[in-house]
Amino acid sequence: MANIKSAQKRIKVIAKKTARNRMIKSQLKTAIKRFEEAVEAGNLEEAKVKLTFVEKKLSQAAAKGTVHKSSASRKISRLAIRLNKAI
């Protein structure tokens, strides 16, 4: 445990940010999984809706710094390509 007050505060702040990042990444994984299930099932209309939701969540995560901007862009691109191949 840190003895300096500022270090103690940083420990608390890091714990909060880690929890937030973990929650956001978990939501992203779930949303991507739901999209992939819709594509595999052949529900293209549902998959389009899921893709817009995933794009929104990935963009928000990139804006917050949870995932890198390039990583989010790459994932969005790959998911869109996957949907277009299914159509």
Curated annotation (Swiss-Prot):
Keywords: Ribonucleoprotein, Ribosomal protein, RNA-binding, rRNA-binding. GO terms for molecular function: small ribosomal subunit rRNA binding; structural constituent of ribosome. InterPro entries: Ribosomal_bS20, Ribosomal_bS20_sf. GO terms for cellular component: cytosol; small ribosomal subunit. SUPFAM superfamilies: Ribosomal protein S20. One of its GO terms (biological process) is translation. Binds directly to 16S ribosomal RNA. Belongs to the bacterial ribosomal protein bS20 family. This is Small ribosomal subunit protein bS20. It comes from Alkaliphilus metalliredigens (strain QYMF).
